[in-house]
């Protein structure tokens, strides 16, 4: 009997089934119910260097990398697929959790005349302040400006809106994720989120996104300039934060001082974050809001300070409204009809359901 067991132990592996008189050898235990033995994945020897390589590629925990390599018999591609499938299962388990923390990411592509503002949520502020989370938001923003966006609602002012029911339209877009070795790896936005969920163990979602489209200037030869701002007290790089805005300007003529125009554009993006307007002009106030004022015997002008950008006191020149300052600057820069074509302002959690 002992000789039979020793023979079985020497020859037992994942491909060979050894008859041992109805005694199974499994992780050193004798079981009397089966007539074969197999090698457990935990018995696969995993070289440390492979664990290190897989961790650098995927940023997954060390133990998960080891399990993936054991399950794939030390095949790197197989281990990566194993981690992705496990990550999908983890994401599925976590998706019912409330994610109301996170960041706003903003990005302008001056070459194409496009801009994006998106909200990416996590469960905790701790995760949202980490570089892994923030860098993913930056990578996703960059990818969305380099690819066509399907679905969504295109407003008259040229803003393309993706609400929570439509934002998954961007998930198939490919992005490049840089691993710890500095090597870029291509994957879909969806898979990149799955990977970070698997690593951070939190429900992570893209809540919404808005895109400024290139200016259609076929009619009046208008020019445009786009600026953005994200408020983050912990960083000098103002592209992610808990508040953010993108704003598009339109004008005619040749500007005699682009630096002054850029400075004003950046300052107005900050003004929008600070003062929370929701429309550009009085004429943009929704009819439903005006109707509500009428029903409540409330003067619509009482809304101007809070809602209308042009009617607000410009924070960098308080004696002037934003509209007045635009007129002054337009004359100073030698251009005509400097105006705000559109803007969007996001704040973390303002559309999320909290419990």
From Swiss-Prot:
Molecular-function GO terms, alphabetical: translation elongation factor activity
Keywords from the UniProt entry: Elongation factor, Mitochondrion, Protein biosynthesis, Transit peptide
Compartments reported by the entry: Mitochondrion
Superkingdom of the organism of origin: Eukaryota
CDD domains: UBA_EF-Ts
Coiled-coil positions: none
Gene Ontology, cellular component aspect: mitochondrion
InterPro entries: EF-Ts_dimer_sf, Transl_elong_EFTs/EF1B, Transl_elong_EFTs/EF1B_dimer, Transl_elong_Ts_CS, UBA-like_sf
Disulfide linkage: none
GO biological process, one term: mitochondrial translational elongation
Transit peptide: 1-46
Chief location: mitochondrion
Function: Associates with the EF-Tu.GDP complex and induces the exchange of GDP to GTP. It remains bound to the aminoacyl-tRNA.EF-Tu.GTP complex up to the GTP hydrolysis stage on the ribosome.
Family, as annotated: Belongs to the EF-Ts family.
Name of this chain's protein: Elongation factor Ts, mitochondrial
Organism: Dictyostelium discoideum (Social amoeba)
């Amino acid at each position: 009997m002992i000789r039979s067991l020793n023979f079985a132990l020497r020859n037992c592996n994942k491909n060979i089934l050894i008859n041992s008189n109805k005694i199974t050898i499994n992780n050193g235990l004798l079981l009397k119910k089966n007539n074969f033995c197999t090698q457990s994945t935990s018995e696969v020897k995993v070289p440390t260097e492979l664990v290190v390589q897989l961790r650098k590629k995927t940023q997954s925990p060390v133990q998960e990398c080891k399990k993936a390599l054991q399950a794939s018999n030390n095949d790197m591609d197989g281990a990566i697929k194993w981690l992705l499938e496990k990550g999908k299962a983890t994401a599925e388990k976590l998706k019912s959790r409330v994610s109301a923390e996170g960041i706003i990411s903003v990005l302008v592509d001056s070459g194409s005349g496009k801009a994006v503002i998106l909200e990416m949520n996590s469960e905790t502020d701790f995760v949202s302040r980490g570089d892994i989370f923030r860098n993913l938001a930056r990578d996703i923003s960059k990818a969305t400006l380099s690819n066509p966006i399907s679905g969504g609602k295109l407003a008259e002012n040229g803003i393309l809106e993706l609400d929570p029911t439509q934002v998954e339209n961007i998930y198939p877009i490919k992005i490049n994720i840089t691993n710890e070795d500095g090597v870029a790896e291509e994957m879909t936005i969806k898979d990149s989120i799955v990977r970070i969920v698997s690593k951070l163990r939190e429900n992570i979602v893209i809540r919404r996104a808005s895109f400024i489209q290139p200016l259609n200037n076929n009619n009046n030869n208008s020019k445009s300039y786009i600026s953005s701002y994200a408020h983050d007290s912990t960083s000098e790089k103002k592209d992610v934060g808990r508040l953010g805005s993108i704003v598009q300007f339109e004008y005619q003529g040749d500007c005699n001082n682009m630096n002054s125009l850029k400075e004003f554009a950046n300052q107005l993006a900050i003004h929008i974050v600070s003062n929370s307007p929701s429309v550009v002009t009085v004429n943009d106030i929704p009819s439903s809001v005006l109707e509500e004022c009428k029903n409540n015997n409330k003067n619509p002008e009482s809304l101007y300070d809070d809602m209308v950008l042009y009617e607000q006191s410009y924070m960098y020149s308080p004696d002037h409204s934003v509209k007045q300052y635009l007129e002054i600057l337009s004359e100073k820069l030698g251009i005509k009809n400097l105006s705000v074509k559109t803007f969007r302002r996001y704040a973390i959690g303002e559309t999320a359901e909290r419990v």
